[in-house]
Amino acid sequence: CKEALFTLGEKPELRYRAARDALAEMGYASTTEYLFAAAEAVFKETGLLPHLNPGNLEPEELAKLHSVSPSMGIMLESVSERLCEKGMPHYGSPDKIPAVRLQTLENAGIAGVPFTTGILIGIGETRLERVESLLAIRDIHLRHGHVQEIIIQNFRAKEDTKMVNAPEPDLGELLWTIAVARILFGATMSIQAPPNLSPGVLPQIVHAGINDWGGVSPVTPDFVNPEAPWPQVEELSRETASAGKYLTERLTIYPAYAQDIERWVHPDLHERVLEMIDTEGMPRIDEWCPGDVDTQPPEEVMSAIINPVKHLSADVAAIIEDAKAGKELTEAEIVRLF
């Protein structure tokens, strides 16, 4: 594992005395302060990269949390004001008012935080409202370039909730929405659908337009959807392969953002992020690096050492001979070798 996901209720101290008392007893003035301390401790003690989903945030909160978390997120769910009316799913949830969530997306862009967001389908919204929600995300992303992932999440009815008997969206609605998201955001945006919410139809979901399964943990349940267990990674790999794609790991911060580290990652996290990525911004598969005499090189490197390339261009051969002789290589020569 390379990520520690923090997902929590939004500022419970504003509503519940028990939350205020618990925070005060631990010495924190707010849940945001507590979250900062917890994420900082996890990062320093384990080296895992925190990804935070704490709800709506003010600009100063985002700026502070960004120093302990390379990425954050909040689901927009929908821009439909209609869903906030009495008798509708978002009634009585002021944190889900569309303007409030859109402002958090805007704040994240201003703060330069790589951000995950998305929509929830099957809660009474229309197809038009889904498109409007995706376009609202796109508008903010075009201003700031910070949205690294769009989640298309299908509603699942849960026990002990007011919507326990609400109908769930069918596969056709999910596939339609994924396809529309891909059209609206183009080929470069990462689009995700949670695999544990659609078992048995994963190849169809891939074909609809996703390129990411989101976080799939081998050690914890999905705490947001505990009734829906994660697929085993081996099974997910087979399902992905059956759709003609290759399953590979990524960090919580996407490759393009990790590579542009000066813009998107807080300086306190630079060293760790760089340690974890290869030249393409993907997670490294081993701890070895050139010049490390204490760690066994990976199989690919050992194979190249044991069975070296027999035909080298003259300039590469000359650079290698210089290196063997102890000559300090120029930057251009090092680039040529790679």
Give the role of each language-model region.
Residues 1-145, 311, 334-336:
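Conserved Radical SAM active-site core
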Residues 44-46, 131-338:
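Auxiliary Fe-S-binding modules of radical SAM enzymes
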